[in-house]
Amino acid sequence: MSIITLFSAFMGLYVIVRLILPSGMNWPLKLILSLFALACAEKLLLTKLVYGTMGAFMPEPVQLASGYLHSAVTILFLLLVARDALLLLTWPFRRSTGRQRKIFYGHKEKKPASGFWAFTLVLLALALSGYGMREALRVPPVREVRMQVPGLPDALNGFRIAQLSDLHIGPTFGKAWRTDVVARTDSLNPDLIVITGDVVDGSPSRLEEDVAPLADLKAKYGVIFAPGNHEYSPGIQQWLPVFQRLGMHVLMNENTQIRVNGTPLAIAGVTDTAALNWGLEGPDPEKA
């Protein structure tokens, strides 16, 4: 059992013990909500059991709903921890002023998880989860970074590199999103495009059509790709020919050299540490 699975269970149980059980609801409803909270917390485990690694075959509505609820439970857990920490820190003061109350189970009329604060925390968690999902699903904004490189040859001054990372193409992002990312990247008119891993969340049999828009990425000196950990789970060897057909130059502990106005520029790419889990070559910067 992984650490993530154990911690997810802890989150769910914390929400149950600190929010659901102390409430004034009847026991059948408490049981239903407790199981629901635990299922939401264990979203990653349930996804793997039902839909396989990374949920490549999960329908988009299920992916969105489960992701939203998992995030909400996670945020609710953090809010409850913050609240309980505040109660513990202020306990000496409240005790000295006669305002103390039991941290866990108190009298029926003084349960800390009931009433206004419980409703407020749940509502805040749902709202923050919704905001986070909206931000995650929008086309990412362009972030421009100007680098000062001492001794840079004049021929390379102003060389423009567009970096794409963690696209995680899968059931969550639709075709419009993928097309917009490509269009926005091309509009920058980069000299070189580098894709630094975690392009896909699934196998080619499921996602080859979804990654097709990446073939429209255009740069004067081409598109270079180095894998991330998410390429290894579904099978990196299956994805390599797909990436190459999309026009990407794949670098795995390798380098390639381009000439910019007659000046050589070496581009190196390494594998991900996840390769070691599959008996493949791990990252080797010296070799690259």
Where in this protein do the model-derived segments appear?
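Non-catalytic terminal accessory segments
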Residues: 1-138
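Soluble catalytic domains of enzymes that build or remodel membrane lipids, polysaccharides, and related
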Residues: 143, 148-288
